[in-house]
Curated annotation (Swiss-Prot):
This is tRNA pseudouridine synthase Pus10. HAMAP family: Pus10_arch (MF_01893). The active site is at 275 (nucleophile). Disulfide bonds: none annotated. Responsible for synthesis of pseudouridine from uracil-54 and uracil-55 in the psi GC loop of transfer RNAs.
């Protein structure tokens, strides 16, 4: 123990440096645990054992000095003052007769590590956790401001905060009682505790389900669309549903998950979105469903997929459990797409014109201003996107089908119509005819296993 309880060490400059601040005990009668916490980064032992050893060593040293001072008849007031401070902080082994001081309460921990108090908090937390299904947890410790201020005043370079120690020790106890594992990165539940006020509340972290969806019919938005008039509150226009459209991909997928998990709400995160009148075919669009405050986490994904797919309007594929960062990937990962468009032209079209169209649009840069149809909700910007490949097939004199492989974020309807010159070039400008998109399907999102990157 001599390496840490020695009062001084030699610095690189050759000067003595204080490492143990016993003087702090004159102002604050820190208990063994709290005094040891000031030097928590020294030695592999508990804070209580470390603090006890430091105090006993100093008390022994002071008692010896005082006895010698008495024998020699010299002043020992300074040593006596510190020895009394040690007695107030809980050192009751002092043998000097003129030291009769009662132990004072520790101003730092205020007894929060008392075994009975810890058990009381533990039982309270377990009672709150009973109604939830979870595997991992984290302790969130909340400390009063006056305790934080005290820590700043007495801080040493070797100290750990009382917040750290309480969270660690309480977490160990909870892990043993529940046979659950603490998890700092992705806990199912965070148990928030203020050990000073004995307040406890739970933070139920979301359950994330990732997969892909196919939208097989037109006329359904991807997410719930609030009524524009009442903004979701319910009015005569929306038949008091609060919605512009009666159903969405989000609601079709979320409903069975909410029923199975007993969650309070769900949020849908898609890798982009298709228009209401556009189908999403092929192998589907990646999505993450965020279920808020689930009570049940162990659910049968295959069974839920079967239930969703029975609807006939939406299908889900490749369902698996995800994590929070999966939903962020969508916002930062560009991906190309393949579309099928049915185009209607004002004048007759020829096979030669369609061949010209394929040639003109191959590896072509498109300059596209925000479409007029969405200007009311999006900034008027110019986007630069690229069309890589186009394949056409004639349907009749005024209709043809296009397979378009292009950058994500390109508005296909406006690529076809030209949007009164706001998209350049366009199918209309190349063919010199008025063309419109009659039907549009997303055939593939070239995401390179977007969800697996997480």
């Amino acid at each position: 123990m001599a390496s840490i309880i020695n009062k001084q060490i030699i610095s690189p400059t050759g000067r003595n440096m204080e490492i143990i601040n016993y003087e702090i005990l004159k102002k604050y009668p820190l208990c063994d645990r709290c005094f040891g916490r000031l030097y928590a980064k020294l030695l592999h032992t508990t804070n209580t054992e470390r603090g006890r050893a430091l105090k006993l060593y100093k008390a022994l040293e002071l008692e010896a000095k005082i006895k010698k001072a008495k024998e020699k008849g010299i002043n020992y007031e300074e040593e006596l003052e510190l020895l009394k401070a040690l007695a107030k902080s809980g050192v009751d082994e002092i043998r000097l007769e003129d030291i009769e001081i009662e132990k004072e309460n520790c101003p730092w921990c205020r007894g929060i590590f008392n075994k009975q108090k810890m058990e009381k908090l533990l039982n309270k937390a377990i009672e709150l956790l009973k109604e939830y299904d979870f595997d991992t947890f984290l302790i969130g410790t909340h400390i009063p401001e006056e305790i934080k201020d005290l820590e700043k005043e007495i801080e040493t370079e070797f100290m750990e905060s009382i917040k750290q120690e309480f969270g660690r020790e309480f977490g160990k106890m909870l892990a043993v009682r529940l046979d659950k594992a603490p998890d700092k990165e992705y806990p199912d539940i965070v148990v928030h505790i203020n050990p000073y006020t004995e307040e406890i509340y739970l933070q139920i972290n979301p359950l994330f389900i990732k997969g892909r969806y196919r939208k097989l019919v037109r006329g359904i938005p991807q997410t719930r669309w609030p009524c524009r008039k009442c903004r979701g509150k319910g009015c005569e226009l929306c038949n008091y549903t609060g919605k512009k459209y009666p159903i969405s991909v989000e609601e079709i997928i979320a409903k069975p998950f909410l029923e199975a998990t007993k969650g309070v709400d769900a949020k849908f995160h898609g890798a982009g979105r298709e228009d209401i009148d556009v189908r999403m075919l092929g192998d589907g669009r990646p999505f993450v469903l965020e279920i808020k405050e689930p009570k049940i986490r162990k659910i049968d994904l295959n069974k839920i997929a079967e239930e969703i797919n029975k609807d006939g309007r939406v299908e889900v594929l490749n369902l698996e459990f995800g994590v929070r960062k999966d939903k962020v990937i969508f916002k930062n990962t560009p991906h190309r797409k393949t579309y099928r468009a049915l185009v209607e032209c004002s004048d007759k079209i020829t096979d030669e014109e369609l061949k010209l169209l394929e040639k003109e649009l191959e590896n072509r840069t498109i300059y596209q201003k925000t479409p007029k149809r969405v200007l009311h909700r999006r900034a008027d910007l110019e986007r630069i996107r690229k069309v890589y490949k186009v394949k056409t097939s004639k349907v009749d004199d005024n209709h043809f089908e296009m397979i378009i492989y292009c950058d994500g974020g390109l508005y296909i309807k406006e690529l076809i119509s030209g949007d009164d010159g706001r998209t350049n070039p366009s199918v209309s400008s190349i063919l010199n005819k008025n063309c419109i998109c009659k039907e549009l399907d997303v055939l593939k999102i070239h995401d390179n296993n977007l969800l697996e990157k997480g």
